[in-house]
Amino acid sequence: MKKRISVREGNSGILHIRHEDATEERHIPSYDLDEARHLLLRFQELRDGEGSYLKDNYWCEGTNWLPTVVNYLYGRIFGNYVRYRPLLKQLIDGELEVALENQGELATIVDILEGQGDGRFLKPHLFNGLMLFNNWLTVRRYRAEVLFFRFTPDDFRTTAAKSTLDELGVRYMEALGVSKRLLLTNVFRRKPYYFYGGVPIENSFGLDYDLSGVDKYTAVLFTAALRRIEWMISAYIREQKWHVRALNSSEFKTFYGIDDTQVIFPLLYACQQQQIHTVAHQHGAAYNKYHASYVMEGINGTEYRWFDKLITWGEFWRDRLLAVSEVYSPDRIVVGCDLFEPRHVSRNERTEGRRNILIPYEYLANTYAVGRYITKLMDLGYSVFFKQRPDESLEDQIDTYCLPIGYPERLTIIEEITPRAMENIDIVAGTASTLIYQLLIYGKVTWFLETDYKYMEDLVELGHARLVRYEDLETLDDSYFEPTDADPKYLFSSETLRDTLQKHVLAGEA
């Protein structure tokens, strides 16, 4: 008999499940990044009836489009399948019926497995036509020298860059991810917004591959993944052509934005076709072996097109990217300023005997496991400081850690990192946040908390953090409280954001 459950997903992917008999349980996802990587590589190596590899079958007009969906495959499809595999197997077997109370990562993978979302949209031709018309009209009405890529009008990742461009008096136009609301609003309250991200209309490929070597669950997964990415690639190819037409009469000299590896390819390739110089700016600590779309494992470097130039925060990041991937040319990677403002600070000595530990919110991490660390640290007498993220509600962020009653109230909330706030901190700990790297310059004790989410374990491998296990918290010796010895100048350039933009964004191809 088919079971029926109702599921609410928390911000970090933890599922709150309610059964038909009103009992409730919590499902903690699996965060096995190695398994997601294994599925990605196996998928890329599938062969069609003629023996051609899947990764070689999506060329169009001189471009291999398969790399444009690697991020989606790894994170949204294979990563989510690994996260929720026990439930998804029951779903595939027809033993489970799921009512989703909200949209999240489970909803994404369920839709993919059920073939939902492939070309389903209210009047897609009309929507795409409106986007194309908006872009064509905007380019002609508003002249600008820089096309500035952002996810949304209030994207915190690019706030500092936007302010600096304003201070420099640069004529720029924002390129934003399209949505029905934003597009329709802009039709009537016209702003100089250029949109990217059209709606899929049809699958131009429909290729078949040999799945005889995989189990039935993997076969279902690969079939669904194939269907989804073929829709995406088909849409990307069409979107690129729309952008080429819209940009025909533009005056853009430079296309600039964060180092995205998913949504930006159609506009990026169109800019390159129109001889517009393209520059990416590092936005996070993603240059490690577990970020598939920066590593591009199994992809030939000569077949991967990305930005003409990449600005990294420091020599450390340039070296890391070149160490974990073979698809990048060293002469296209330069060192500039951190997108989140310069971070050179004076270090202060740790106060003897004080146990103030800073743990930042990490929505991609195993927050349940980190919550156990927080609880035990409090029980051991540590004062836990929690750095909240600016784009989610504080209550929702804390809720992801599943803390016992009474423990959330004991957290000291930090809204913004400042030198003064860091004077109160002795230890910085986490598993996945860019902030852990950014705080190395303060010379604090740095801990990498052991969980099944190993995204930033290179912190330990490079000697920038101590690996701390939950079962060892009560018996840590003095070596665990030695401050981190990392060279701030190697991690983060002393150059200002203003100088970086003038040198690498506003100076053409220099």
Predicted region positions:
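Catalytic-core helical/loop segments in enzymes performing group transfer/polymerization on anionic/lipid-linked
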Residues: 1-510
